[in-house]
């Protein structure tokens, strides 16, 4: 497997992780539900799980109860198969002032609940296992395979590499549920070791929302199984990422961080129609579409590059904070901002640029014939040098390999400004104006972009190439930049 190397420092997200002596804040659990029926259901599941685990050793009465359990499970499965659950909502938790957006996933029998980063830029599901010895594992929720009666272990190793580090463990299969939907035989990674600071409390892992072709495990992603099954009312996911950057009253962990709707779009969150840009069959790897133009401070900027041609392919990545662009493009972007300068390579922050904090930056990207603005709050990440009059920008210089199918990584700094649709069939990415927003306008035909980008539902992606695994996970890699917690130079 190949990975794109990114020479960036690992900046620690300054979250107050609990010590071993402090109990973790409980996630939603049926055991403590205010609903008596929910609590009773949890209790019955504990008994069923125990009987299942020790079935060969049960006495006569236990065997009889186990047979009843099996009948009940079959009835439940048939009922579920005959029911069409139209949509389901993943309520997002905003961690680190927009550094990561996480949803709750339930794994095993009985279910164990975890917060996992919802990442449209990768395709694997993994969670920290209870045998993990890393410090972060001791301070967050971990999956105990021994207490799940439905877990099937595998001897196959699991490894996934990001720009910020890697995670290692083994593959397993179990029942996985999210937003009211269940996949009974989902393959995922049970992680036993990670690079330092890859993730931290309250996070326990990651849910990949991209296509199967880039899954390190080779498993069909949870979302893709559901979209293909017909269980969804509409084969798409609607994404809204809430902004807490610039909110002085916000905390490091905000439970009202937006939502992902499985099975449709939340029409109450956007105005007008959705502008879909088609994805070719050969491009089902990352969620990627071609960029057609860019305007900053009222001036068109050339987006052409040696690797991406006139219309670079952009991965739309909810698991990333920054907007990664080729270094020559970053140069052009910041040359339009008076007083902007690159942070030196010797400082360890190569790729970042800073500019006067009092500068109001207007910037827009054009996809599918429409221009979408990025708010100044998302463009300006805050001050990270001893010169507090200078602020760091969201566009980050990062040259991808010539074999990479994507040249830009478009993260939450952009996605927060639009309502985003990820459509399974026909494959497409769509954008719409958020309610209360004014981020969308007709594209500018006089843009410096030249060549063959098309618009609307007929838009296509860039040419396909040899696949490379995702090599930058900037959402948590640069958590400190996203939340403004470091003074570095």
UniProtKB/Swiss-Prot annotation:
Disulfide bonding pattern of the chain? 132-137, 357-391
Task: Name the Gene Ontology molecular function terms of this record.
Answer: aspartic-type endopeptidase activity
- Main location per the UniProt record: secreted
Q: Which UniProt keywords apply?
A: Aspartyl protease, Disulfide bond, Glycoprotein, Hydrolase, Protease, Secreted, Signal, Virulence, Zymogen
Which residues are involved in binding pepstatin A? 121, 161, 163-164, 286, 320-321
Q: How is it modified after translation?
A: Activated by the autocatalytic cleavage of the propeptide. Cleaved at the end of the propeptide promiscuously from residue 76 to residue 79. C-terminal cleavage by autocatalysis at Gly-456 at the pH optimum indicating a possible regulatory or other function of this propeptide.
Glycosylation sites per record: 266
Q: Where is the active site?
A: 119, 317
- Top EC class, one word: hydrolase
| Alphabetical list of InterPro entries matching this protein | Aspartic_peptidase_A1, Pepsin-like_dom, PEPTIDASE_A1, Peptidase_aspartic_dom_sf
Activity regulation, in the record's words, is:
Activated by low pH. Inhibited by pepstatin A with an IC(50) of 1.4 nM. Inhibited by acetyl pepstatin. Inhibited by HIV antiretroviral therapy protease inhibitors including amprenavir and ritonavir. Inhibited by HIV-1 protease inhibitor brecanavir with an approximate IC(50) of 352 nM. Inhibited by HIV-1 protease inhibitors CGP53437 and GS-8374. From the tested peptidomimetic inhibitor molecules, macrocycles containing P2-P3' tethered side chains, statines in P1 and an alpha amino acid in P2' are the best.
Record note on pH? Optimum pH is 3.5-4.5 (determined with 100 mM NaCl). Optimum pH is 5.0 (determined with 40 mM phosphate-borate-acetate Britton-Robinson buffer).
Subcellular location(s) of the protein? Secreted
Q: What happens when the gene is disrupted?
A: Loss of endopeptidase activity in microbial minimal medium YNB (yeast nitrogen base) pH 5.0 as almost total loss of endopeptidase cleavage events of the substrate, but also a substantially decreased carboxypeptidase activity. Lower Cryptococcus cell density than wild-type at saturation when grown in YNB in acidic conditions. Growth defect at pH 3.5, but not at pH 5.0 or 6.5, after 48 hours. Cryptococcus cells are growth-defective in the lungs of the infected mouse host.
Gly residues compositional bias, start-end: 450-463
CDD domains the record matches: pepsin_like
Keyword Glycoprotein in the entry? The reply is: yes
Record-level GO cellular component terms:
extracellular region
Question: Which residues are propeptide?
Answer: 456-489
| Family, as annotated | Belongs to the peptidase A1 family.
Q: What PANTHER family does the record tag this protein with?
A: BETA-SITE APP-CLEAVING ENZYME, ISOFORM A-RELATED, PEPTIDASE A1 DOMAIN-CONTAINING PROTEIN
Tell me the protein's name.
Major aspartyl peptidase 1
